[in-house]
Each structure stands twice: as C-alpha cells, then as structure tokens.
C-alpha cells in the first residue's frame, strides 16, 4: 500500500511516440487523436507529469477528461497518485468523474489518501467522491491513509463520512511452519476482514487509532483469524497502541488465534505492555494453544510448535525476562509450571519431547527462538538473574527433562559457571 507514481499504469515507455508532447500540443487536433496501444492519452501523461499548462491546452482543445486506459486509469487518477491538488481541481472542474476507478476498484480518492495529500483529498470529497469506495481486497481510502500514517487525511476522511467499521475482504490461505513439508504443520488460516483500526495497530499509528476509536471503532476489534487489535499491536512492537486500546476497554484475553496479547508482549520484551495487560485482567496462566505460520527462510516472528502449551511465565523464563516473571507471579502466574512440549524439528522430521521448568527454560532447554535478541555482553548476567528468580519463586532445581538432564547439567555444559555455582548452592545435583 505504499504510495507509488507508477508510469507502468499508463504504458512502460513513451506511448505518444517519438515526437514529444510539448511539440504535439501545438496542434489542437492532437487532443482528439486516438489513444495509444494501452489506452493512454496525452492528457494522461500531462496529468501524470503534473504539467498544468499542457493540461489546460489539452482540455481547451477538447481532450476527454474521463478517458480510461486498459487498467481503468484516468487522468484524474494519475493526478491523484501524485497528490497534486491543483491538477486534481483542474480536472474535476473540467468534468472529471471523482469516482472513476481502476479495474481493481482503486479510486482517485484512495490514491490521494495513500499519497497523504490533504488538499487533493479535500478537493475530491468536495466533488462528491465516495469515501467508502473499495479497491483490491476490499481496502478503503481510510485504511490506506492510516497505514501510511497520514493522520490529517484520516481526520478529513472521517469528517467526510468514511466508515470506521468497513472491513477488507476475507479469504483463506494454506500456511505452515518448519518443517514445511510435514502435513500437521500446514493449515488453512483465514485472512483479511481488517478494519482501519487493525491497520493502525499493525502500522503503529497511534494518532489515527485515537481518532478511529473516538469515531466509534471497537477497541476489541479483530480480524478474520481472530487476532485482536491489541494482540496485533503487541505482536508488531507497538505497545503504546496496545496500552491505549486497553484503556479504552479492549479485551485483554482474546485467544482465538492460539495466542494472546500477553504472549506477544512477552516475546517482544515489552514489560510496560505486560504490566498494562495484567492490570486490565489478562490471564497470567493462559497457554499458547497453536503454532503460528512463517514464510520459508524469513525472519518472521511466530510461535513455533515447541512453544505450544507454554504459559506466559514459562515464556518469560525461556527468554530471560526476570522482571516480567516477577510481574506475572504477582498477578497469579504459577511459578512452578512445567512445560511439556511435543514437536517435530529439522528436515529429517525428528520428533522431540521436552519437559522443562522455568529454571531449565532460562538455560535454553525446551526449545523456541527469541524474537528480540539479547546483547551478548549482558546475556550471562541475565540468565543468572532469571535462574535466581525462578528458584526464588519455587522452581525445583533438581527436576529432570525427559532425557534425564537437569538445569545443572545444562549450566555446566554451556560453561555458565556462575549459574552452576548458584544452583549448587541451592542443592542442585547433576544427573551425569
């Protein structure tokens, strides 16, 4: 949805031939000549190039202001892509239809909103442009303005009647996690049904989110999959939006997609949002109930199969967040939780089962990959503090994994001398 001035929409090369437009404009008859092979006219190009003088000449010579090329692009759409208010106004005054859309449904208003040009948006609305027209996948001008952080345009669209409850189209898509070839790690996931508020949560657009909620958007909104705006904001690292939505009454416990906003905030190491979620009633013991997909060879954040059934407290221990562990315990999290995992890893489809406490998780046992990497210089001290908090809150230092290993075994194997010494001081015994 990024703003693009794409000359390809009106032909990849100079569709008017070898003679330049400036020379051809000398002859008024040029305005009436047939369009080029892709349907583009000289008026398209003059509008696209933001040449107001040439546009004036062409219009006076009788050029069709509503001519559309093969993809439905009109001169007004080209001007709107540029966000040129003077050009938009000139074409509208000459009779250009404000809602003439591309074949995909994208209207001039949508293009101007994406460009973030308030004056162009205002001119289109003043001429009756539909603020709720939908383009590809059912997206609206309001959604595009929000996604591009054009808050002033968002405000104008809302004043012009844009629907805060409008949703994008819904479809389903087969998605997977590694190893992608394993049938049980492939499933159909609903996509779309996003409102403008969901776009704000994803993009981190707090100013727009506030305007949308004030205009009636539901703080507990969710998409077709069931991901809430709060969870999406936390997932995307926009804790300030998640906290705002909570203050406005958002449900902190939506777990429809298999995870909650609390899980996302922990994975993002966002202690402020974790605190806000707990203060608003988030369940400190809600487990991750389903893996989430990722693209092949990507750096996407996702809940891998090894994390299914993990609780917030275990996640905080696994990813060395002692402050969050204390917060969770204060709000009722079970610090003696034992995570039982059962998953497949590697292209060899190796089945693995793990049984780990918070102490073991802090040492990397139990699987899973961090979303936010920790600076290597401070990692050892953070692991030690996490282990200390886990033991302080009641974790069994001599619990064993399914293959018989203890936390002390892991500490020694990884040469965490300070951690091993601490565990020994608390009665830990090696199994091997």
Feature roles, as predicted:
Residues 403-432:
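Leucine-rich solenoid repeat scaffolds
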Residues 51-59, 84-92, 117-125, 150-158, ...:
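Ankyrin repeat structural motif
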Residues 32-71:
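N-terminal segments that cap or nucleate solenoid repeat domains
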Residues 36, 69, 102, 135, ...:
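Ankyrin repeat boundary/linker residues
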Residues 13-26:
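Bacterial N-terminal signal peptides
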Residues 45-50, 78-84, 111-117, 144-150, ...:
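Ankyrin repeat A-helix N-terminal signature
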């Amino acid at each position: 949805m990024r703003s693009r001035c794409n000359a390809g929409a009106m032909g990849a090369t100079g569709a008017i031939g070898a003679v330049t437009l400036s020379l051809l404009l000398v002859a008024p008859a040029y305005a009436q000549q047939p369009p080029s092979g892709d349907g583009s006219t000289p008026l398209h190009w003059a509008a696209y190039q933001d040449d107001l003088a040439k546009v004036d000449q062409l219009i006076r010579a009788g050029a069709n202001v509503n001519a559309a090329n093969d993809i439905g692009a009109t001169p007004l759409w080209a001007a709107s892509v540029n966000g040129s208010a003077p050009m938009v106004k000139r074409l509208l005054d000459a009779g250009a239809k404000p809602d003439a859309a591309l074949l995909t449904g994208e209207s001039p208003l949508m293009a101007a909103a994406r460009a973030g040009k308030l004056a162009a948006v205002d001119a289109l609305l003043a001429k009756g442009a539909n603020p709720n027209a939908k383009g590809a996948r059912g997206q609206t001008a309001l959604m595009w303005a929000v996604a591009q952080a054009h808050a002033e345009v968002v405000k104008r669209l809302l004043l012009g009647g844009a629907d805060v409850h409008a949703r994008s189209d819904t479809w389903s898509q087969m998605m997977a996690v590694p190893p992608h070839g394993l049938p049980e790690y492939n499933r159909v996931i609903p996509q779309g049904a996003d409102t403008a508020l969901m776009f704000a949560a994803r993009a981190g657009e707090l100013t727009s989110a506030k305007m949308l909620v004030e205009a009636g958007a539901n703080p507990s909104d969710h998409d077709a999959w069931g991901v809430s705006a709060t969870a999406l904001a936390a997932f995307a690292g926009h804790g300030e939006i998640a906290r705002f939505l909570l203050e406005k009454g958002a449900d902190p416990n939506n777990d429809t997609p298999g995870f909650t906003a609390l899980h996302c905030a922990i994975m993002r190491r966002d202690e402020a949002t974790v605190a806000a979620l707990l203060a608003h009633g988030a369940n400190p013991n809600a487990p991750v109930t389903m893996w989430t997909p990722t693209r092949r060879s990507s750096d996407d954040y996702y809940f891998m199969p090894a994390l299914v059934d993990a609780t917030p407290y275990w996640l905080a221990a696994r990813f060395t967040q002692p402050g969050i562990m204390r917060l969770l315990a204060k709000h009722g999290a079970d610090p003696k939780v034992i995570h039982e995992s059962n998953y497949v890893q590697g292209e060899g489809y190796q089945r693995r089962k793990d049984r780990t406490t918070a102490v073991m998780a802090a040492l990397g046992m139990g699987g899973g990959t961090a979303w936010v990497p920790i600076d290597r210089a401070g990692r050892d001290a953070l692991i030690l503090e996490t282990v200390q908090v886990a033991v302080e809150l009641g974790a069994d230092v001599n619990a064993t994994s399914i293959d018989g290993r203890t936390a002390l075994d892991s500490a020694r194997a990884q040469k965490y001398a300070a951690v091993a010494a601490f565990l020994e001081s608390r009665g830990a015994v090696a199994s091997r």
